[in-house]
Amino acid sequence: MLSRSARCSRAVLFSAKRSLASQANTGANASANQVMVSKHVQDIDPEMYDILTKERKRQKHSITLIPSENFTSKSVMDLLGSEMQNKYSEGYPGERYYGGNQFIDMAESLCQKRALELYNLDPQLWGVNVQPLSGAPANLYAYSAVMETNDRLMGLDLPHGGHLSHGYQLPSGTKISYISKYFQTMPYHVDSQTGIIDYDFLSKTSKLFRPKVIVAGASAYSRVLDYKRFKEIADACGAYLMSDMAHISGLVAAGVTRSPFEYSDIVTTTTHKSLRGPRGAMIFYRKGVRKVTKKGKEVLYDLDKRINFSVFPGHQGGPHNHTISALAVALKQAATPEFKEYQAAVVENARIFGEELVKKGFELVSGGTDTHLILINLSNLGIDGARLETLLENINIAANKNTIPGDKSALFPSGLRVGTPAMTTRGFGPQEFAQVAAYIDRAVKLAIGIKSQESPDAKDARSKLASFKELCKESDQVKQLADEVYQWVGEFPVPGEL
């Protein structure tokens, strides 16, 4: 008779052989299609994998200054590439049009719960929809919930720091944003001298225009918003106050800037900027009593059903469950002490970055920043935002040209927009942003010199810019500076490297 240990050894060996045989049979029986869908991208599509590799390298070795960009966490990326994307789930938790959604319901409900908790919102007084695919559609869904076609909307003018999704049309009447086709839109402005929103102008024009919605929000405005004043203005003309905190939602979550929730009826946000989540959006909306009439009658909000219906089935079909699940992870991270420290650093880095730019002779729109964002006025430097953006890209610095008050062209504006969230994520502090300011200063000097060499055959603005781009690629000074930046920034890890 075999000993107990021998019997155990034989059992283990038999089990291992059976497992290997099973795997062999599975492999032998697998169809070509099953084999294909089990391969990694580097095996199935080397061409696309090569592009991915190049983009990873670009991000690693570039200074990312675009304020709306960030580096999301490895754990968020885990969910974005997960099985959560396989499931169709039209509808809402507990009310789906497809079966098999019990875990999808859990994920979406958890995401909603964390969103309300992050901003200290009472679920009896606030609700949130986490299904919008991105920020501009989220704004459209919110407008459509409370307005009919041709109702009136006011938002910050695009050249003054607003966003296309708040409505934009040219002085000639040409409607650039389709929001201005669906609704009647009128902009409000910043004061031309201070660069600060002209609340008195908004108050006067809103009483004449009588909008249904006033949007408090911006994409290129570096100062805190006076939500209390916005609410007073909205109440005076009977409008909903909708705050778009897409750029600052991470700062709001960490308590390092003013929150819109105290005074707003609706709050929208993207989730991938300062919040550092996946590319998505959320719509928060009030519940309960909206106002009390002179006769003492309570008028209740009815935003819950209207906004949820506007999202689905009004505009969207199946939500992106991998994004919602990834957002839930990002919201958990945003509630941590580490995230609060990060956001405090974002604001402090922006302040110091702005001061360093001023020391080098740059003028900042509004004189500085209270947030994560800086808008540089280039109008007195002999270079435009389009050319400076081009040269910066050639030296591995990503920033973006931007209109400033008084600009006539969005293609050749006088501003450059920069911000601190992405590089703060990678470990930049005051010393590093001082170095970035020095790089921008060197870039401006190079750009001015290269501009003077543009081809005399280039007659129109686009041809001149094309000539400038070619000269940038050929410049030895540009190549030397590009290599310097490449080596320096590559020393700072991207998420997932530690």
From Swiss-Prot:
Major localization class: mitochondrion
Top EC class of this enzyme: transferase
Intracellular or extracellular location(s): Mitochondrion
Catalytic activity: (6R)-5,10-methylene-5,6,7,8-tetrahydrofolate + glycine + H2O = (6S)-5,6,7,8-tetrahydrofolate + L-serine
EC numbers for this chain: 2.1.2.1
Required cofactor(s): pyridoxal 5'-phosphate
GO terms classed as biological process: glycine biosynthetic process from serine; tetrahydrofolate interconversion
Keywords: Mitochondrion, One-carbon metabolism, Pyridoxal phosphate, Transferase, Transit peptide
GO (cellular component) term, any one: mitochondrion
Pathway the protein contributes to: One-carbon metabolism; tetrahydrofolate interconversion
A single GO molecular function term of this UniProt record: pyridoxal phosphate binding
Family matches, as InterPro entries: PyrdxlP-dep_Trfase, PyrdxlP-dep_Trfase_major, PyrdxlP-dep_Trfase_small, Ser_HO-MeTrfase, Ser_HO-MeTrfase-like, Ser_HO-MeTrfase_PLP_BS, SHMT-like_dom
Location of N6-(pyridoxal phosphate)lysine modifications: K273
Record's signal peptide: none
Family: Belongs to the SHMT family.
Remaining remarks: In eukaryotes there are two forms of the enzymes: a cytosolic one and a mitochondrial one.
Its biological purpose: Interconversion of serine and glycine.
Subunit structure: Homotetramer.
HAMAP family: SHMT
NCBIfam families cross-referenced by the UniProt entry: PRK00011.1
Name of the protein in its database record: Serine hydroxymethyltransferase, mitochondrial
